[in-house]
Amino acid sequence: MAAATEENMSVAALVMSVPDNIGRSPEVEGGGAAGEEKDAATKGTVAVGDSEEDGEDVFEVERILDMKCEGGKNLYKVRWKGYTSDDDTWEPEVHLEDCKEVLLEFRKKVAENKAKAVRKDIQKLSLNNDIFEADSDIDQQGDTKEDTSPRKKKKKIKYKEDKSPDDLRKKRAKMGKLKDKFKTELESTSEILGFDVKTKKRILEVKEELKDSKKPKKDEIKETKKTKRADIRDLKIKIREDVKDNRKTKKERYIDSPLESESPNDSFTLEDESEDFLSDNKEKQNVRTAKDKTGQDTVQESIFEKHLDDLISIEEAGTRVRRKKKQPRKFEEPKEIKKLENTNNFLERKMIPKKQRNQDKGRSNPELSKLPSPVFAQTMKSLRLSGEEKGLKSSDLAEEEKERKNEPKEKYQKRYDFDKEEKARKEPKGLKSFKEIRNAFDLFKKTAEEKNDLENNSKREEISLDYKITHDNKTKDKCSLREERNTRDETDTWAYIAAEGDQEVSDSVCQTDESSDGKQPILSLGMDLQLEWMKLEDFQKHLDGEDEPFITANRIPSNLLRDAVKNGDYIAVKVALNSNEEYNLDQEDSTGMTLVMLAAAGGQDDLLRLLITKGAKVNGRQKNGTTALIHAAEKNFLTTVAILLEAGAFVNVQQSNGETALMKACKRGNSDIVRLVIECGADCNILSKHQNSALYFAKQCNNVLVYELLKSHLETLSRVAEETIRDYFESRLALLEPVFPIACHRLCEGPDFSTDFNYMPPQNMPEGSGVLLFIFHANFLGKDVIARLCGPCSVQAVVLNDKFQLPVFLDSHFVYSFSPVAGPNKLFIRLTEAPFAKVKLLIGAYRVQLQ
């Protein structure tokens, strides 16, 4: 009878532990132990409804201190009347159904705190670890909280013993339904009380909680640590002793009274104890099943002991990690309380006879450990929580160590961390030493770590404070770019065109850089220029390459000079070119790339000016015919194109595929480069290898502005040429049609001009008609073109299909007789050499009629 009573009371303790597996009052925690002592004293005299526990044990809720969300459920921290802060427990909302007024009062206070926080100014969140303490215990806030909340009673739930295993199954099903119902109710309440992490209210709420919360004193922290360690040790010893005692009692129970091992129907009721025993055969079978059951129990007890040892070792490891911290986390205490509760529940689960698992005899031994026991599930959950807690502690330690290291550098890094980050994304313009590159990499790495710290400290926020700082830095960069454009407008006419037309190109050429002393971000024009103190005269000297010389005793080899030009290191190039060393500035690599081409392809305007002033040639050609101007036009560098054109770069040079700089600019759709090249005398009618003109590439890029610009320029050239012919012949010559499109040739690009064209003669040639070749001197003044059939240029020979053509007038070499044949024709013109002449020649042939 005594054994049966103990078994039934332990079953009742298991059922009572089911709804309290999340958070339990201190009286409920001690209920199981008190019940066992009572059973030992009464020895079977307890009847249903006659014991003292049949009365209602009343616990009054004094107030609700805090709320948190764990596992999708809202838990409330409850202060019980007559108990200290050490006895506070986390209770689900379901346990507070009789205390709705207290719950509503707590929610009202939360809403009032929100309203107060909205009125305050928004300040930056501190990057320390105090953010993690926002949802910690508020044990020290007793004087700030009001005690005016009404006191309600929480009744202890009384569980009656089941009459049969069928009733137990029904009760389990009901409990499962209740759990589902509780989950839905908790989800609905969490949706109502959930904070919007995408708004600034959450930030303000965290600040308010940070201000209201107080850190526990060091003495109290030490005392709580000592008590926790002592509790863990006592619990471990108690568990092992209970397991040993349980083994002994079971063995004695099955050896001394094997007939007392009843069937599963007899294990759950007190009334069935008076029934007759089974037959002798059934008794023998029960003895065998009892022995088998003891064997299974011993196996499971060993698994259980290992399970508990692992759990306690994890807790001890957690306490070791906690010793290293300066300030312990408050929110970790509820988790440790839960671990103690879970171990107690596990112990109660172990003390219960395994008769419930005999109900399903078809299950194997591993399946027995997977029974729908809420205690076992809660224990597994506590293991997961302890693992997560351990990870949190290790991450917190790393964060604290990093903060201690970064404290003296925070002020310096706050101003420049985002500038460094943006600078690292862009292609570096200057050749830096190894130490500078390493420092920049370290600083970039630190800024990335700081971003991770911000994300870890504000997990509930999606609004990042980094956005504001980066936005401010971007506005500063834009302002500095405007100042730089204004300076260049006053000094360089070509750069004025660049800043007026193409902002994107100027942004890529003139990037913001940071000074080496770290005081103020300054502009970088391919070198370390400090424009805040540089005057206009000094800047003009810099543009002309006449600024202060740099002298060094060390010789810089040619390969390092080439690397410096490629990387945009102005100082290194300046030092090398001002030294006594003689360099071949027109040196080429395996592809024919010169230093000027490298500077032009990289958009290094300062290096390009420096090389040009030192005598580098701008019209070098690679093996495929590419020039520095073609590189600059292809890379869309407007100011670089302007510098090269001013230095005398050839505009009509063709690559091996027949493309020119004008075609490259049309491909990129840059109307400013197209206008600049056209005004310098680019030929719009040159055909590529695939018989495509610049007008074709303008159509391909779908840029209407570029297409209209080319079309209007060609129409202007044709109109000016026809008007010049009529004025020259005084309307005695009628122009019928052009033989080939009008061409443009710059005399400085060479004395030879050649072109190919197809001619289709008309079927009926009227009398007095023929074909004449005209060579005009032209000047381009913006959109205006002035042409004349005279000038200093001397035409030496005109050859058409290997036949010399004769001039019409003996005293003029600008009008020639022209006899093309049907089909393809090849024209060659030899002019006098004038490498420095800026005159442009328009060449066209017309079928004319004498009047």
Curated annotation (Swiss-Prot):
Keywords for this protein: ANK repeat, Chromosome, Nucleus, Phosphoprotein, Repeat, Transcription, Transcription regulation
ANK repeats, residue ranges: 591-620, 624-653, 657-686, 690-719
Subcellular location: Nucleus; Chromosome
UniProt biased composition (Basic and acidic residues): 159-169, 279-295, 329-364, 401-428
Gene3D superfamilies recorded: 2.40.50.40, Ankyrin repeat-containing domain (1.25.40.20)
GO molecular function: chromatin binding; histone H3K9me2/3 reader activity; histone reader activity; methylated histone binding
Biased composition (Acidic residues): 269-278
Site (Interaction with histone H3K9me3): F59
GO biological process, one term: constitutive heterochromatin formation
Disulfide linkage: none
Description of post-translational modifications: Phosphorylated in M (mitotic) phase. Phosphorylation by CDK1 promotes dissociation from chromatin.
Region (Disordered): 21-54, 133-174, 240-302, 315-428
Post-translational modification Phosphothreonine, affected residues: T144, T379, T447
Residues the record lists as Phosphoserine modifications: S51, S85, S136, S149, S164, S188, S263, S267, S274, S313, S386, S394
Domain Chromo: 59-118
Cellular component GO terms, alphabetical: cytoplasm; heterochromatin; nucleosome; nucleus
Residue numbers spanned by region Histone H3K9me3 binding: 80-87
Pfam families in UniProt: Ank, Ank_2, Chromo
Function: Heterochromatin component that specifically recognizes and binds methylated 'Lys-9' of histone H3 (H3K9me) and promotes recruitment of proteins that mediate epigenetic repression. Mediates recruitment of the HUSH complex to H3K9me3 sites: the HUSH complex is recruited to genomic loci rich in H3K9me3 and is required to maintain transcriptional silencing by promoting recruitment of SETDB1, a histone methyltransferase that mediates further deposition of H3K9me3, as well as MORC2.
PANTHER family: M-PHASE PHOSPHOPROTEIN 8, ROLLING PEBBLES, ISOFORM B
Subunit structure: Homodimer. Interacts (via chromo domain) with histone H3K9me3. Has the highest affinity for H3K9me3, and lesser affinity for H3K9me2 and H3K9me1. Component of the HUSH complex; at least composed of TASOR, PPHLN1 and MPHOSPH8. Interacts with DNMT3, EHMT1 and SETDB1. Interacts with MORC2; the interaction associateS MORC2 with the HUSH complex which recruits MORC2 to heterochromatic loci. Interacts with ZNF638; leading to recruitment of the HUSH complex to unintegrated retroviral DNA. Interacts with TASOR.
Domain topic, free-text comment: The chromo domain mediates interaction with methylated 'Lys-9' of histone H3 (H3K9me), with the highest affinity for the trimethylated form (H3K9me3).
Protein's name according to its UniProt entry: M-phase phosphoprotein 8
Species of the source: Rattus norvegicus
